[in-house]
């Protein structure tokens, strides 16, 4: 699937990002009995170097997938200094199973590392087994709950330490 696929950083309020965000919200509503993701997000949260919003496009410039990270530091929602929180990972149904989410995830991790973040964190839910499988296979492990959904039984929080870039001697 990678042939003709390209990743592009866009603002959170870009029309293609809004289109995919609406689709992921519908999927959340289907999986979680009418509830979408109510986490407050602001476009400024994804402006480099404090975050990044990526879209994957096919050769016809159709948006197929999204993913983002935003900087988090110690606060009353359970984050730690140096955290980079993954948000809005989504692949349209017809493009699933072809490595797009893994490719976006790797790019988000690399960008967060370059921005000096020390740990990637994310919230997903128990009704998203394919997301949980992706994150486990990419080196994430279950962590203490944090964020907006930390009190929800269905919430699954995960974390992965980021490797700091090595310097050449």
Q: Regions from the language model: what does each represent?
A:
Residues 3-87, 92-94, 105-107, 111, ...:
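Acetyl-CoA-dependent GNAT
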Residues 12-13, 54, 118-121, 125-169:
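C-terminal "cap" of GNAT-fold acetyltransferases
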Residues 92-94, 98, 126:
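Active-site acidic-Proline motif in GNAT/NAT acetyltransferases
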Residues 98, 114-118:
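Short coil/turn segments at alpha/beta junctions that flank glycine-rich nucleotide-binding fingerprints
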